């Protein structure tokens, strides 16, 4: 079942256009949106989150138009970004208090468990944390209100490999029940080999290829023929 689907999604700027974005994210799967910087990954996710107003097309969550979702339905979707989205004066504990106020389905037990699992210091201010610790705080927060869909915008791309691997294990556990899903954007192809079930390539605002991970090797030559410059691989 498609938990998320876009139909002819568009976002038009003077110097850049996102056009005809038709993507599907299935329950129980991790889908990667991949492209070089400036390809349209963040614009796509901005439209999904509502931060950017789409110019056209539809976004469906569990078959329902995103524009008509109730607040409760919207709380089933969690977003995490490459920069922490809370005031840097907040402590890690205060991030959790904010979540408990904002979300009726906030799971304090899960939050505390994730803090322990990810070795996050509850009483430290965000401004005192490393980039990796901030990313782990953002993701722990996103997972603690029991979303059905987690959308990550380059959240792991600038982290060191050890932290990335730790988070990849967490993401795989998240979708194990077959009812939840993850869409994440990245320009690092090694992440795909570890966890992605499906990879969608975007280039200059267009989707150029959508493949199962098992098909990646045989299709790789086609991707290189469609783009001007390579994606980073570690």
Give residue spans per PLM region.
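Conserved structural motif at the start of ABC-family nucleotide-binding domains
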Residues: 4, 18-20, 74
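Conserved ABC transporter NBD signature motif
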Residues: 57-68, 73
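ABC-family P-loop ATPase nucleotide-binding domains
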Residues: 81-137
């Amino acid at each position: 079942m498609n938990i998320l689907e876009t139909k002819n999604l568009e976002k038009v700027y003077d110097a850049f256009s996102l056009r005809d974005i038709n993507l599907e994210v299935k329950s129980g799967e991790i889908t990667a949106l991949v492209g070089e910087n400036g390809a349209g990954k963040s614009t796509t996710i901005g439209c999904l989150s509502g931060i950017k107003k789409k110019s056209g097309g539809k976004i469906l969550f569990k078959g329902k138009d995103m524009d008509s979702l109730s607040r409760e339905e919207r709380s089933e979707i969690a977003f995490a970004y490459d920069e922490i989205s809370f005031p840097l004066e907040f402590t890690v504990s205060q991030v959790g208090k904010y979540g408990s106020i904002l979300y009726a389905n906030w799971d304090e037990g899960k939050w505390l468990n994730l803090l322990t699992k990810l070795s996050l210091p509850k009483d430290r201010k965000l401004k005192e944390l490393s980039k990796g610790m901030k990313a782990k705080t953002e993701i722990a927060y996103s997972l603690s209100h029991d979303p059905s869909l987690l959308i990550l915008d380059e959240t792991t791309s600038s982290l060191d490999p050890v932290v990335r691997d730790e988070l990849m294990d967490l993401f795989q556990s998240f979708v194990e029940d077959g009812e939840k899903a993850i869409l994440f954007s990245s320009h690092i192809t090694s992440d795909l080999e570890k966890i992605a079930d499906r990879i969608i390539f975007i280039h200059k605002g267009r989707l150029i290829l959508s493949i199962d991970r098992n098909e990646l090797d045989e299709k790789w030559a086609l991707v290189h023929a469609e783009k001007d410059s390579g994606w980073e691989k570690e």
